[in-house]
């Protein structure tokens, strides 16, 4: 039974998404349906957690908009995600960045990972 589930899930996994990590700044382009119209909305922020694996994998992006923290959780392999762009690589030492919720201003920034 497990092999059947894995085979079905493997067909539905997306391979066009980049490999990003916790602490990275990403732009997530999401399809939004309003009535009969469909448009693409961008949500930019820091990845504070990734959960599960396989088809059920989710990630949460946090940003501060007008002084209010906004967190949004996306299913990784959902068809509503048009594309994901990595704008900055972050250098962190934790798997979950929940401590950013309590920080304000520059203290809420993540160090940038410099690659050569």
Curated annotation (Swiss-Prot):
<keyword id="KW-0687">Ribonucleoprotein</keyword>
<keyword id="KW-0689">Ribosomal protein</keyword>
<dbReference type="Pfam" id="PF01245">
    <property type="entry name" value="Ribosomal_L19"/>
</dbReference>
<dbReference type="GO" id="GO:0003735">
    <property type="term" value="F:structural constituent of ribosome"/>
</dbReference>
<dbReference type="GO" id="GO:0006412">
    <property type="term" value="P:translation"/>
</dbReference>
<protein>
    <recommendedName>
        <fullName>Large ribosomal subunit protein bL19</fullName>
    </recommendedName>
</protein>
<dbReference type="InterPro" id="IPR008991">
    <property type="entry name" value="Translation_prot_SH3-like_sf"/>
</dbReference>
<comment type="similarity">
    <text>Belongs to the bacterial ribosomal protein bL19 family.</text>
</comment>
<comment type="function">
    <text>This protein is located at the 30S-50S ribosomal subunit interface and may play a role in the structure and function of the aminoacyl-tRNA binding site.</text>
</comment>
<dbReference type="InterPro" id="IPR018257">
    <property type="entry name" value="Ribosomal_bL19_CS"/>
</dbReference>
<dbReference type="InterPro" id="IPR001857">
    <property type="entry name" value="Ribosomal_bL19"/>
</dbReference>
<dbReference type="InterPro" id="IPR038657">
    <property type="entry name" value="Ribosomal_bL19_sf"/>
</dbReference>
<dbReference type="GO" id="GO:0022625">
    <property type="term" value="C:cytosolic large ribosomal subunit"/>
</dbReference>
